[in-house]
């Protein structure tokens, strides 16, 4: 099966937070972008999101020809995907909706176009069941903000051709991303399963009055979060084992896994818990608008990525190492 390996035109189906992030990343890489979303104010919100993201993208570095002027908002799905080399769907996480969307997308798209979904946990075998030419359909699950964070989880369904996955990995790399091939179809894939465990424990700590939302965020951002930005969980614990490494760590701290510290099951989302979380995060946000916080976040991300890349280069490493 022939699939596209180099793209010039990128189609975005859905223009919410994730979809607009894809649009901004594609524009920053010098592509022509077509976008569609059924919401009445979708085009206005999309252009506002791209405008808010652009200063961070300029700091990170734009490809030749990159411009928000290369974004075209169109009235139908068919107009969006007909001439696209790569289609990225970022619709709400409802399987029935994605089944319907991908039936339409796949019939209107070019035969060799790659079709991807941003789903964070639905399985491609299921929601591509009615797709035309499902061998060119994949999942490309990004992380917010999509235009800055490099990770994208990539996997196919039972009928996806291996060549399609390989081509998608290359295209995402060309967009400045760090694609991670997911070896098996599992709900939640890799990163969100890890984040979900942390999120559940955080909610338990708030619910039981152990800590506020701000204190929990501080525990992450002044502790493990700093290490995680350049050295993940397993390598961090390898160092904790000293010269003997991971085997010593597992022998010394492995029994602690049996201690009943964590809850793991989701807490009941009572009105009281929801109110406590909302009030806590409102206090953290203070008078700053969401757009202002996004700009602050984006500047932090670009500076952190640049700093890590510089240190790795001095140690003879690539950023993705």
Curated annotation (Swiss-Prot):
Compartments, as annotated in UniProt: Cytoplasm
Gene Ontology CC terms, in alphabetical order: cytoplasm
Keyword presence, Membrane: no
Catalytic activity reported: carnitine + NAD(+) = 3-dehydrocarnitine + NADH + H(+)
Binding-site positions, NAD(+): 14-19
Gene Ontology terms for molecular function: carnitine 3-dehydrogenase activity; NAD+ binding
UniProt-listed Enzyme Commission number(s): 1.1.1.108
InterPro entries: 3-OHacyl-CoA_DH_NAD-bd, 3HC_DH_C, 6-PGluconate_DH-like_C_sf, 6PGD_dom2, L-carnitine_dehydrogenase, NAD(P)-bd_dom_sf
Record keyword Cytoplasm present: yes
GO-annotated biological processes: carnitine metabolic process; catabolic process; fatty acid metabolic process
Family: Belongs to the 3-hydroxyacyl-CoA dehydrogenase family. L-carnitine dehydrogenase subfamily.
PANTHER family, sorted: 3-HYDROXYACYL-COA DEHYDROGENASE FAMILY PROTEIN, 3-HYDROXYBUTYRYL-COA DEHYDROGENASE
Record note on quaternary structure: Homodimer.
Name used for this protein in its record: L-carnitine dehydrogenase
Taxonomic lineage from the root: Bacteria, Pseudomonadati, Pseudomonadota, Betaproteobacteria, Burkholderiales
